[in-house]
């Protein structure tokens, strides 16, 4: 069923607190731009929400947090979906498109310290300090730069992770700046990690709005939320990831910046143990963002990324 002005536009969202905060922000923005329309949020649980005791890399990541939202749109039950862009696969199902990318929150990673480590930075933590992270990307980079630290998997929503930190299960956590700020935990950030030690995930800090490809009405509504600079940066990042066939199973990091119409993309592929790290940058016109991403991926493949990727896929790809 196509949305009409006579009924509410239905926005699909995961049920998690962060997802709802993000979706309700999109709902409010759409309402501001389109006062003659009504918007309602429809929540649902995704496969990724139900798997809390297994590292995501062990179960694959093709739509773990998006598939149910996408099926709902394809069935005509909802009209659009709001995703953390980093969770949205680079290949979308037939009939769906990435309609808009919103203005990005700081995409960097943050160090969140337990109380007894207050005043430290990542560089001053002593040997054996236990760092919680569920991301292979963060893990590989930090193992590379800080081999003396101890890393331990952590799952659960943001509140759960912070509670585990405060209970002493970890000495520190590595979390996304964006998620912490959106949920009102910005004061827990001990250090924003520099790009020199932690390139961020593709799309981190941005929201992606997905809808049906043929739904011209919804496409037009959603376009009003698009942020051109964020879009160019994220399209370059997603093209880079698509060429590498990566996801949360693979330690792939990026960093993008736009100055004077020129986009500089830095990309990284690391081995799981952090021993090998292939990293390089390219600069080009903003209008060629996706081409730039593809070119950088091919450049990294030539420098050894393909061998690293093959080893990782052989190790962590889930059984079909």
Swiss-Prot record:
Gene3D superfamilies: Periplasmic binding protein-like II (3.40.190.10), Porphobilinogen deaminase, C-terminal domain (3.30.160.40)
Keyword Transferase applies: yes
Record keyword Glycosyltransferase present: no
GO molecular function: hydroxymethylbilane synthase activity
Pathway stated in the Swiss-Prot or TrEMBL entry: Porphyrin-containing compound metabolism; protoporphyrin-IX biosynthesis; coproporphyrinogen-III from 5-aminolevulinate: step 2/4; Porphyrin-containing compound metabolism; chlorophyll biosynthesis
SUPFAM superfamilies linked: Periplasmic binding protein-like II, Porphobilinogen deaminase (hydroxymethylbilane synthase), C-terminal domain
CDD domains per the UniProt record, alphabetical: PBP2_HuPBGD_like
Catalysed conversion reaction: 4 porphobilinogen + H2O = hydroxymethylbilane + 4 NH4(+)
GO CC annotation: cytoplasm
Record-listed S-(dipyrrolylmethanemethyl)cysteine modification sites: 248
Cofactor binding note from Swiss-Prot or TrEMBL: Binds 1 dipyrromethane group covalently.
Keywords on record: Chlorophyll biosynthesis, Porphyrin biosynthesis, Transferase
EC number annotated for this UniProt entry: 2.5.1.61
Pfam families from the UniProt entry: Porphobil_deam, Porphobil_deamC
Cofactors (names): dipyrromethane
GO biological processes: chlorophyll biosynthetic process; protoporphyrinogen IX biosynthetic process
Note: The porphobilinogen subunits are added to the dipyrromethane group.
Role this protein plays: Tetrapolymerization of the monopyrrole PBG into the hydroxymethylbilane pre-uroporphyrinogen in several discrete steps.
NCBIfam families listed in its UniProt record: hemC
Subunit organization: Monomer.
Family: Belongs to the HMBS family.
Protein name, per record: Porphobilinogen deaminase
